[in-house]
Amino acid sequence: MGNSLASLATPCFADAAAGGGRGRGHHAAGDDAVAFDDDDAAGGCNSIGHILSFDGRDAPAFAIHGVLLPSNPSTMASTGGGGGGGASVLNDGALSIGSSSFDSSNSFSFRTLQPRQYSGPLEYCTTSPSTSGASSSRQLGPRTDKQILNDIYANRQRRRCQGSKGPPLLGRLRKAVASLLRAGPCGFPEQEEPAAMINGVGVVRNGEESISRNVDAAAADDGAERVQWARGKAGEDRVHVVVSEEHGWMFVGIYDGFNGPDATDYLADNLYAAVCRELNGVLSEDEPDPPEAAAAAGRCNGCGGAARHREVLDAMARALRRTEEGYFAEAEARAAECPELAMMGSCVLVVLMKGADVYAMNVGDSRAVLAHQAEPDLSHVVLPRGSHHDGDGDLAGVKEAIKRQFDECEMGELAALQLTMDHSTNVYKEVRRIRSEHLDDPGCITNGRVKGCLKVTRAFGAGYLKEPRWNKALLEVFQVDYVGSSPYISCRPYIRHHRLGAQDKFLILSSDGLYDYFTKEEVVAQVEAFTAGYPDEDPAKYLSHQILLRAANQAGMGFHELLEIQQGDRRQYHDDVSIIIISLEGKIWRSSQ
């Protein structure tokens, strides 16, 4: 991969009270030791972002880390009132985030990221248990590639040992051998549950009923103790997280806006409630199947479970469509005073988790990436044929070959599985679709952008690229040459279900700013390497540091030179970035080890 493990060098995560002011002058990033302070007092003059964390002691199924790193200015909503709050009148929710960087219930916390500068070599900070059981911090010098690799190897070795202590390995061996017995002479296992592609929607048929019928209760009162929530912003990005500790499900929405904040604010205020309403409608249409019917459906290649997952995914897509309809209705009512609402839009990434079931939905180029242990390649494990072979001996040899394949996978690097689909002009399929829908407009894609304006090919809002009337409502200087009446972009989402397994380690949700500097494989490798060396530290915070370092290096300036650039002007060097990392390892699967 293109990333260097040496870039894992990360500064000590010191407490704000530890002191340490900013040094004078400018220094190259490689010459400084740079750290982030976690200052509970938000709004420092040199604040560069915020950290989000979840302390759900009653919901130990996952750990959540997040970071919001703005580059665009905190723009007042176009329809904001005169009270100075900056909240859009399009947002009728009880909690508007237009005038605040964050808000949350008591199980979530936000801290301000403040840069610190040291002189001397870069140091690292971690914690290790002392003999008395208390935690003590230790300072380490700069780590070499060998030390980093040793940490990763030791972490993988621990995972391998944990997986070998109980029946899971035997079960995996039995399943693998059974698949080989069903295979043809060449040893290729049969495709048991093919993915279904229905109207461009990918549904993985490998799960069962997941969402509780009581999901609507979580939407009834965001302030109730059984529901914990957090909402924040980074420039034009918005993040919304809801965790139901009573029902054990979680909603994460990341909205990457453009041309103004109104569309993202509207999404943050309305999409979650719309999803809850649609799920309630789907799940209350009929009573749940009795156990014997559910078991029969499971024997039928999981058809019953796949049908229910499809219903949930369709409900999420309907919620997005109806939320956009509501946004356009409000925008039309205010078109005379705020015609620029027709230009505002947002990418949408939503992930809904219930137990081991993950439902992902997106339009635009935000991504959900799952880090998982690669499955072993059993295509070369061939069962012997013929009666002259020793059955027991041959079977033992097959089991040993399969075990070697599992061992190799468990000691290998984590793979990156993208649960979403990119909708941008970088994707040939999307460009071809738009051109085929606009054969009479050779300028539908200009300079790598839709009508020369947007890189994304699907988005929430942005009515001026969906209907001629919205385009005509704009001032002439902002209008595009709209040919015909067909939309240039759509809000048709990609939706997918995935059932988590013991091989899944963590989930990374982010706006596209993260992938300006990393591939998805590099992001997974960076988080794996960091958590191997610093298991108690915040990987999202570490990624934000790496983004800024790479942005500074790419611009040929020092780290602190970049941070001294005012928010807004910094957009020339990096995009707004919102990252949520959900740790799965050792949480959901604790009971099976």
Curated annotation (Swiss-Prot):
Specify whether Thylakoid is a keyword of the entry.
no
Under Gene Ontology molecular function, one entry of this record is: protein serine/threonine phosphatase activity
Which residues are noted in the entry as Mn(2+) 1-binding?
A: D256, G257
Report domain PPM-type phosphatase positions. Answer: 221-584
Q: Where is this region: Disordered?
A: 123-142
Q: What class of enzyme is it?
A: hydrolase
Q: Which Gene3D superfamilies match?
A: PPM-type phosphatase domain
CDD domains, per this entry?
PP2Cc (cd00143)
The biological processes this protein is annotated with in GO are: signal transduction
Composition bias, Low complexity: 126-137
The record's comment on cofactor binding reads: Binds 2 magnesium or manganese ions per subunit.
Keywords from the UniProt entry: Hydrolase, Magnesium, Manganese, Metal-binding, Protein phosphatase
Q: Which PANTHER family match?
A: PROTEIN PHOSPHATASE 2C, PROTEIN PHOSPHATASE 2C 46-RELATED
Q: Which family is annotated?
A: Belongs to the PP2C family.
Protein name, as recorded: Putative protein phosphatase 2C 46
Q: Which organism is it from?
A: Oryza sativa subsp. japonica
Q: What is the lineage of its organism?
A: Eukaryota, Viridiplantae, Streptophyta, Embryophyta, Tracheophyta
